[in-house]
Structures are given as C-alpha cells and as structure tokens.
A protein has these predicted regions:
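Conserved catalytic core of two-component sensor histidine kinases
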Residues: 16, 43, 50
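Alpha-helix termini
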Residues: 19, 33-36, 58, 74
C-alpha cells in the first residue's frame, strides 16, 4: 500500500457544505448592521442637537432656527454627521423647536425630536411622542 496524504473529495465536499450552512445562519444576523449604524448616527446627532439648543437657549433665551459650522449671530454652531440632512423647525422664541434628520442609508425614513409643549412650527416629527427624546421608526 502506498501512504497517500491529502483530503478526499468527500471530505472537501463536507467542509464546503458545513461552511455554506454556517454562512446561511450568519448572514441574516449581519444584514442590517449598516442600517443600525446609520440609525445610531442619526439619534446621536439629534441628542447632540438637543444639548446644543439648550446651550443656545441658556445664552440667548430663544431657541435657534438655523445652524451652521461657523459662528454667526442668531445661528446655532452645529454640524451633523456625514450624509445626514438636518432640518430645524420652530419659532425663534422660547416656546420650543422640532427637528427632523435623515440619511439616504436609512430606509425607514427620518428621525425626529421636539422640545416645548407650545411648539408653533409646522414640522413636529410625528414619530416623536415624548418631549426631548429622539425617535426613529
């Protein structure tokens, strides 16, 4: 008898089948990882916006209705994460504000937050039910 070294075709096929089964189990668990990461970024931006708005209110006794990356009178100095689009809606007074934020990588839509029970703007995020708590669908 000769002493052969290596794997038989059957052994290789069994390994391929086992790897295929493991991949079929693992892929659905990781399929929406990117969407979860984008959602976390959206919620983080809304939480940071709420903190920045409260700081702006402490300085000027009104909430900001616009934002930018440079210092400007009456404008909140704030920037959002890459590819996020933020819209602040609210009166420039002490009654409150609302904001929605979206990202093309987040299929369910936009996230929102509002502050103030007498909010006079027209864009109060419908998904937000608790004041100051950012919500995503």
């Amino acid at each position: 008898m000769t002493n052969r070294k290596g794997f038989t075709l059957i052994e290789l096929l069994i390994v391929v089948v086992v790897i295929g089964i493991l991949a079929a189990i693992a892929l659905p668990k990781f399929a929406n990882t990117k969407e979860k990461a984008v959602k976390s970024g959206l919620l983080s931006d809304l939480k940071n916006l709420a903190a920045a708005q409260e700081g702006f209110y402490a300085d000027s006794s009104v909430y900001a209705t616009t934002y930018g990356t440079t210092i400007s009178t009456g404008q909140l100095q704030f920037s959002v994460s890459q590819r996020n689009t933020l819209v602040i809606d609210g009166a420039s007074d002490a009654s409150g504000w609302a904001a929605t934020i979206s990202n093309p990588g987040y299929a369910p839509g936009s996230c929102g937050i509002f502050v103030g029970s007498t909010f006079s703007g027209s864009g109060t995020p419908a998904a937000s039910t608790q004041e100051g708590i950012p919500v995503c669908p």
